[in-house]
Amino acid sequence: MYKIATMCRVLEVSTSGYYAWCKRSPSARAQADAELTSRMSAIHDRSYGTYGAPRIHAELEAAGIRVGRKRVARLMRTAGLAGVSRRKWITTTVRDRNARPAPDLVERNFMVPGPNRLWVADITYIPTWAGFLYLAVVLDAFSRRIVGWAMATHLRTELVLEALNMALAQRRPAGVIHHSDQGTQYTSIAFGMRCRESGVRPSMGSVGDCFDNAMCESFFATLECELLDRRHFRTQVEARMAVFEFIEGWYNPHRRHSGLDYLSPINYERGHYSEESTASPPPST
């Protein structure tokens, strides 16, 4: 350890100036940065370490804290805070070449004016030490909310039927389009019958084309980078609980989405219904 006088001489500063600097109170800017960093660290922890600068900035703005995104990014770098990056998911789709797919009613246009107009669906896999689980989801294209999902150790039609039935029970839509690829589960007779009896309009893109089902791919990429890449499941029960907590406890109610003005899916839907009720004229008397 060097003496202070020696270090001051090497750095060409006076010892009196050094001691004065030590006694000086932190500047208002430094104090504000320290307080802001503390808030950002708490937000980062609540996001399970997944949020980067854009979503942390959105959280601060929602809390009434006006701050630039560049400043947030700078303070995050200084504090060693970083979000996670997504990677491409692997498709599990197998096409039945003898089945007749439904027509493509979407044609890569996923813009809809409200909830329950268009649902998109797909399947991915969940690795565990006890073997693979498969996750089928139904996602509302308007809000990116997962409205139905199911997990199983198989890829039979029952898996996607369970996810569809959950979505139907929760949302009770009228004439919703259900868009998927041409996987055997979606082209099956049982799935087609369930769609007809519930008033769902099936739509299918091509097999394994990310552009035909970009929204599901985006959700699966988020699931993988924010959960599956960061945890290793010993049992299938552990994996099921983790996926449940991710979808129902984090993604739907809380996770801010860049395509939804950095609102969560549930809050985005609430805003839509609130605007609808405000815009509706009062009943005539």
Regions found by a protein language model. Name each.
Residues M1-T285:
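Charged DNA-binding/catalytic regions of mobile-element recombinases
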